[in-house]
């Protein structure tokens, strides 16, 4: 028997347009599952049940009136780092547990215009800084494939929701791997778009260009459709990506042709050791790419370890950008306080020198990579880790552990290139292990076309964790 949550985003949208499914019935189906299962996987911080029901009724009237929108009546939750007007927005922090957003972020406005329904705000770590989702406002986000293990972060709640069938897809964001990390450990497809593809406005500044919103889905085509909806700019955006040729959904239906793929599993952090399961996923993906006719070559990474301190300067500086009232500083978690202390000690010249060093590295490294259509790497150096693995040590060692877990992802936030996680591999113990594909600036289309080819050759959307049924 097929349940509503078995259907993809595109299938739900088509069923709504064809009046085979009601937006009200879809919303109620997910709200029931959320009520029963969400806390087990730590998916949501806030569930907007009344709003979802009202929006679903409005969508149903629009369908009956013959109105059209690409995602009319389809539920898509929003990560709790992004503002949705008149909805509680905690930023994953007890310091903001009672904050209500006063406006929509631009990406939320784009999702509204597409006709989506808001089920709620998904779980995120404090200010989105860690690569795991454990905070003081919601239960830990857990991968539905093993409830003892973390769903990653910082879009951990979004990935847990989609993998557990508590949303057909989700909005996420990625400033150092925060879409690719949780989609790897939850067995999903995720896109970190090109810098400037999706507006960061109107409130949150992105002075260093690391972070962007993006889709978290079960299928490549769903992600392409969501990216079409989420992409857009607004006055005041510092970065704007070149417009794509055609839609991203069209790219998913296009054969990629024979591509030149550079591959490396050497982390730019010498202390990081890539786990055999992650190497197995990487090697299997390499073999599949070769079988599909692509030219796969080993390459040397141009990203060197001496760049990491410069990235850490940016990361610690970003931790200071959220204005926390002085009387609420004590509510912050130890890692956040540690990063903010580091950030507040950084001088303006130090920050500018770090940005300059990273920009010089990008200017030197990108020409070496641009001779390849795609770069293949492990998404993570380790399989999913137990809940509590990072917090069982002090903040400084916690940050080191995060670096060793995620040595590959943040470089593409620095360069601004698009990158995706492709869920091609599961361990013998049933844990998902993703691989990462990165493309040229502005070329999400090639990544989407190649990922769709990989999905057709080795499908994954039919695989579900035990909690699914």
Region locations from a protein language model:
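Short helix-loop capping/hinge segments that flank enzyme active sites or metal/cofactor-binding pockets
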Residues: 71-91, 253-265, 314-366, 378-382, ...
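Acidic/His- and Gly-rich active-site-bordering loop/insert found
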Residues: 52, 62-136
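Short, surface-exposed loop/helix-turn segments at secondary-structure junctions
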Residues: 94, 98, 239-240, 309, ...
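Short glycine/serine-rich loop segments
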Residues: 103-234, 413-434
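Acyltransferase
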Residues: 20-31, 57, 247, 276-300, ...
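A short helix-breaking turn/cap at a secondary-structure junction
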Residues: 192-283, 303, 449, 458-468
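An N-terminal boundary/leader segment
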Residues: 1-53, 291-293, 463-469
């Amino acid at each position: 028997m097929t349940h509503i949550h078995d259907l993809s985003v595109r299938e739900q949208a088509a069923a709504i347009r064809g009046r085979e499914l009601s937006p009200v019935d879809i919303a109620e189906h997910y709200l029931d599952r959320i009520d029963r299962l969400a806390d087990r996987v730590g998916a949501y911080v806030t569930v907007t049940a009344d709003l979802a029901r009202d929006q679903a009724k409005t969508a149903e009237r629009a369908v009956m009136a013959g109105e059209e929108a690409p995602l009319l009546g389809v539920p898509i939750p929003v990560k709790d780092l992004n503002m949705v007007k008149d909805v509680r927005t905690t930023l994953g922090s007890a310091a903001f547990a009672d904050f209500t957003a006063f406006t929509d972020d631009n990406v939320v406005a784009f999702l509204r215009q597409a006709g989506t329904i808001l089920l709620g705000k998904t779980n995120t770590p404090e200010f989105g800084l860690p690569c795991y989702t454990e905070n003081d406002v919601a239960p830990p986000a857990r991968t539905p494939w093993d409830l003892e293990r973390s769903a990653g972060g910082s879009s951990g709640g979004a990935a847990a929701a989609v993998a557990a069938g508590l949303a057909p897809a989700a909005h996420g964001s990625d400033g150092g791997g925060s879409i690719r990390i949780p989609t790897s450990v939850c067995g999903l497809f995720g896109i970190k778009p090109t810098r400037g593809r999706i507006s960061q406005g109107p409130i949150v500044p992105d002075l260093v260009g690391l972070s962007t919103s993006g889709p978290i889905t079960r299928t490549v085509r769903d992600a392409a459709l969501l990216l079409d909806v989420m992409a857009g700019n607004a006055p005041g955006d510092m970065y704007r990506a070149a417009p794509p040729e055609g839609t991203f959904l069209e790219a998913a239906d296009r054969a990629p042709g024979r591509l030149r793929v550079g591959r490396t599993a050497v982390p730019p952090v010498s202390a990081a050791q890539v786990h055999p399961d992650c190497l197995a996923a990487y090697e299997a993906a390499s073999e599949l790419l070769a079988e599909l006719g692509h030219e796969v070559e080993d390459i040397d990474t141009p990203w060197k370890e001496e760049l990491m301190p410069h990235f850490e300067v940016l990361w610690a500086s970003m931790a200071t950008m959220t204005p926390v009232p002085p009387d609420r500083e004590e509510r912050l978690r130890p890692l956040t306080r540690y990063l903010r202390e580091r950030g507040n000690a950084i001088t303006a010249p130090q920050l500018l020198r770090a940005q300059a060093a990273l920009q010089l590295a990008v200017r030197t490294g990108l020409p070496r990579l641009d001779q390849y259509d795609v770069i293949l790497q492990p998404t993570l150096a380790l399989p999913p880790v137990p809940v509590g693995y990072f917090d069982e040590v002090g903040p400084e060692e916690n940050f080191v552990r995060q670096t060793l877990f995620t040595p590959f992802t943040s470089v593409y936030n620095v360069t601004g290139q698009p990158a995706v996680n492709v869920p091609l591999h599961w361990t013998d113990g049933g844990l998902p292990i993703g691989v990462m594909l990165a493309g040229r600036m502005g070329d999400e289309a090639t990544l989407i076309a190649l990922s769709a080819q990989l999905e057709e050759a080795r499908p994954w959307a039919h695989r579900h964790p035990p909690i699914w049924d």
